[in-house]
């Protein structure tokens, strides 16, 4: 069997206008010229041609897909760049908005300041206009005064009577008013003489008024200086200083006495309060017991002290019986001194509660020995209790 020769023929695809019809090769021409011997060879050739076409189409598709992927990657890169640019633009816009807000705040503050300044300028302008009007009025008044040549001098003088020469100002007004009226009626030749006389009169009187004013001022200053000197002399004189010293000494003595009295009063009040507190804390019975126990301790610590006879009764309860046992200690009989009656006044009423029971003991002229012994025994018991507690 002969090997069949393969001939690749590229057919133009539909839709490509530049594709030209393939030129038949020499071998293809020979095969076309040859008579078709067998149908199998033609089928094989057509299958091979179709496979080649499919491969070429697949290659083209792969190339197109690669191109599409490249363009897609480029588009993704451009999109990422665009996103970065958009983010940067957004950041710049936010910064711009913040700057705009700050500028708006500053502008509003500036506008408020400008409004305040404008209000102040208006007020200043109004005050300046008022001052200008006042200045104009003053200028007009000054011009009128200069034209009239009338000057009223108001002087304050204390304790000085005004001289009679100052009353000439009224006569000056009348004298100036009369020549003006008469000058209109009289001729032109007489006017200058009267004006000159009036001027001379007014100038002389002004000089006299100034001299009187200067003299009165000098006298007033002199008088005030003399008064001040006299006041200083009186204040710092020896008699005044001695009087002040005596007064200060008297005041110091009074204050010392008052302080002493106050201290005595406070001491008495404090003593009373302390006595009250003592009576509240330690009653009179307890105080007497402590006193007797203290005396007993002192006796016990002194050698060769006198032992007095003493009896003590003890009670023992054994139901249904009670036994009273009396213990008698031998010794000398204690001689007690008779105590006088003590009168309690109104001043001692506050301390009466403290010394109530002590007074009762003092009132007895011949107290019972057994009662005294019982008191001493109770004080011993109190001391024992105190030592146990310590």
UniProtKB/Swiss-Prot annotation:
Q: Which domain of life is it from?
A: Eukaryota
Q: Which regions span the lipid bilayer?
A: none
Sequence segments annotated as region (Leucine-zipper 1): 53-75
Under what name is this protein listed?
A: Caveolae-associated protein 1
Which stretches of sequence are listed as region Nuclear export signal?
52-62
Q: Mind telling me which InterPro entries this protein's record contains?
A: Cavin_fam
Q: Which stretches does the entry tag as region Disordered?
A: 1-40, 172-201, 344-366
Residue numbers carrying Phosphotyrosine = 156, 308
Bias kind Acidic residues: ranges: 182-201
Annotated region Leucine-zipper 3: the residues are: 257-297
Instruction: Specify the cross-link site (Glycyl lysine isopeptide (Lys-Gly) (interchain with G-Cter in SUMO2)).
Output: 116, 122, 161, 165, 170, 326
Please state the protein's primary subcellular location: membrane
Q: Which GO terms describe its biological process?
A: positive regulation of cell motility; protein secretion; rRNA transcription; termination of RNA polymerase I transcription; transcription initiation at RNA polymerase I promoter
Q: Which GO CC annotations does the UniProt entry carry?
A: caveola; cytoplasm; cytosol; endoplasmic reticulum; intracellular membrane-bounded organelle; membrane raft; mitochondrion; nucleoplasm
Here the segments flagged for biased composition (Low complexity) are 22-40
Region Nuclear localization signal, residue ranges: 136-152, 233-249
Residues annotated as coiled-coil are: 199-282
Q: Where is this region: Required for homotrimerization and for interaction with CAVIN2 and CAVIN3?
A: 1-98
Its PTM note reads: Phosphorylated. Present in active and inactive forms. Changes in phosphorylation pattern may alter activity. Phosphorylation at Tyr-156 is essential for its functionin the regulation of ribosomal transcriptional activity.
What UniProt keywords are attached to this protein's entry?
Answer: Acetylation, Cell membrane, Coiled coil, Congenital generalized lipodystrophy, Cytoplasm, Diabetes mellitus, Endoplasmic reticulum, Isopeptide bond, Membrane, Microsome, Mitochondrion, Nucleus, Phosphoprotein, Repeat, RNA-binding, rRNA-binding, Transcription, Transcription regulation, Transcription termination, Ubl conjugation
């Amino acid at each position: 069997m002969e090997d069949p020769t393969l001939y690749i023929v590229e057919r133009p695809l539909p839709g490509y206008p530049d594709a030209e019809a393939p030129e038949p090769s020499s071998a293809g021409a020979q095969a076309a010229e040859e008579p078709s011997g067998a149908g199998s060879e033609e089928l094989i050739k057509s299958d091979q041609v179709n496979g080649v076409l499919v491969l070429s189409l697949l290659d083209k598709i792969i190339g197109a897909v690669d191109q599409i992927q490249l363009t897609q990657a480029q588009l993704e890169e451009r999109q990422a760049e665009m996103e970065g640019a958009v983010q940067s633009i957004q950041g710049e816009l936010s910064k711009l908005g913040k700057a705009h807000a700050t500028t708006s705040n500053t502008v509003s503050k500036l506008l408020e300041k400008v409004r305040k300044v404008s209000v102040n300028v208006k007020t200043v302008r109004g005050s300046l206009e008022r001052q200008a009007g006042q200045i104009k009025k003053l200028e007009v008044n000054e011009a009128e005064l200069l034209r009239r040549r009338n000057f009223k001098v108001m002087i304050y003088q204390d304790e000085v009577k005004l001289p009679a020469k100052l009353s000439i100002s009224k006569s000056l007004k009348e004298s100036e008013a009369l020549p003006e009226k008469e000058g209109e009626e009289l001729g032109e030749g007489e006017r200058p003489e009267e004006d000159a006389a009036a001027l001379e009169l007014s100038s002389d009187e002004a000089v006299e008024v100034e001299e009187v004013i200067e003299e009165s001022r000098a006298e007033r200053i002199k008088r005030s200086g003399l008064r001040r000197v006299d006041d200083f002399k009186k204040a710092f004189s020896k008699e005044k200083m001695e009087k002040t010293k005596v007064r200060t000494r008297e005041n110091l003595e009074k204050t010392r006495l008052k302080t002493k009295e106050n201290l005595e009063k406070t001491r008495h009040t404090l003593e009373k309060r302390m006595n009250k507190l003592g009576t509240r804390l330690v009653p009179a019975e307890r105080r007497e017991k402590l006193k007797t126990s203290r005396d007993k301790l002192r006796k016990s610590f002194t050698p060769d002290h006198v032992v007095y006879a003493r009896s003590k009764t003890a009670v023992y309860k054994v139901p249904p019986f009670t036994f009273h046992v009396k213990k008698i200690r031998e010794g000398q009989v204690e001689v007690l001194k008779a105590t006088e009656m003590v009168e309690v006044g109104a001043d001692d009423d506050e301390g009466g509660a403290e010394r109530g029971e002590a007074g009762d003991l003092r009132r007895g002229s011949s107290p019972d020995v057994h009662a005294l012994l019982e008191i001493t025994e109770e004080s011993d018991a109190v001391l024992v209790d105190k030592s146990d507690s310590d």
